[in-house]
Amino acid sequence: FPIVFSINSAYSRREKALEHYSVFKGSALSIRYAHMHWIDENSKENRRGLKINGDEHVNRIDTIYKNLFNNLYEYLHAVKPNPETYDRIIELLGEVSLSNEKIRPFLIDTENSRLQNNLRFMAIGLEKIINIKNYRTPNSLRAYTKVFLNIFPIIFGPFFAHIATDKGMEFGIAIAILYSLVLTILDNIQEDLEDPFDGVGTDDIRLNFPTMLGPSTVED
């Protein structure tokens, strides 16, 4: 059945979305750890003897993350995503980059490289998530599925009539209802999986602010 291919496609997209969202969150957490634990004013790279307020710096990155995930939630949860929200997300990602630059003098070269890699993973994960939101199962396949569901009763009508004549009216009606019910359920499953971010289906991805990025989850 075409609907089976649609379900498989939608399910694969959901699994990919989970993978990319996990990378996005994990990279964000790694950057937060770096801002909390890697800063060393006595680093050999700090040749100018610069100073930094660690608590103020961590509070800033926490505020950026809160705004970033709130805007990401707004974008992904919308039926029609707002391009302005996307622009704000990109700006906030830029603020994360600027925060990384502020601690660059206090990190050794290898740590700076790892920090930039985590930011790159965030950017790549973000774009993959947004592409999954905006580009879904091919329209031709979804349209074919809808056509199949609509013409199914017409095509199989004689079959159900034959069963009703041969086995009894009640049995024929029961088989027709069963077939239609199964296809309707499969179609609903496909619709629920199609957009894993809309919050409609029970299997949708939760987009609330990750508790692992909260200030109370990590101690200095």
Residue ranges and their predicted role:
Residues 14-25:
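Juxtamembrane membrane-water interface segments immediately C-terminal to a transmembrane helix
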